[in-house]
Amino acid sequence: SKSKDALGEESLSYEEELKAQKSILDYYTKSGCKDNEDVSSCGSAQLPAGTKFWRPLSSGCITENYGYRICPFHGKEIHSGMDMACGDHKIYAVSDGKVKYTGYSRGGYGNYIVIHHNINGRKYSSLYGHLAAIYVKQGDIVNKDTVIGLMGSTGASTGTHLHLNIYNGWYLQAGESASLTDPRNYINFPTYNGGAYARFADRTTYYN
């Protein structure tokens, strides 16, 4: 996984991660989960099994790729995910899953949502940042058609857009290892080379 120094400020601080993990622990304790019990199957709702990923907007454009960039806030850094704007501002879950956490990151993502997924038996997480509104809560079961929030410009943001992170593993899960990966490794998007924005008109069309 990338270090916070390399990622700059567009990531959760250690204090924010600890706060989120405490909230998550409290949630599962109140849901009746016992020590060493699998959190994907305890509580009020089980984590559903999915088969694929979908784009999180019904239409939009790519405005920033994953990887090294020059950030207006922090200089050269690794951009931890992909940025999307234009089009429809409703944000959908990228796959079936369970809402792990919703919160606010003052120095980075602003209003954000973390969802855990089980895709073909493998663990993944998705994070949606800079939201204007959040429509789900911790523990909610979602699918690809669930509108989870609205695109916004909260946190460290220069304009209305969605920031999407994908992790291998369950992010914010105590005792679990989760590493950032390029969302393009799992979700098909049109190519963006830093010039004209790369647009897409739906959630399914395949781009080479």
Which residue stretches match the model-derived regions?
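Short beta-turn/strand-loop junction motif enriched in small, turn-promoting residues
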Residues: 68-71, 98-104, 118, 147-153
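Acidic, glycine-rich catalytic/binding loops that coordinate metals and/or anionic ligands
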Residues: 137-140, 165-208
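Short glycine/threonine/proline-enriched tight-turn/helix- or strand-capping micro-motif at secondary-structure
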Residues: 41-46, 61-95, 116-117
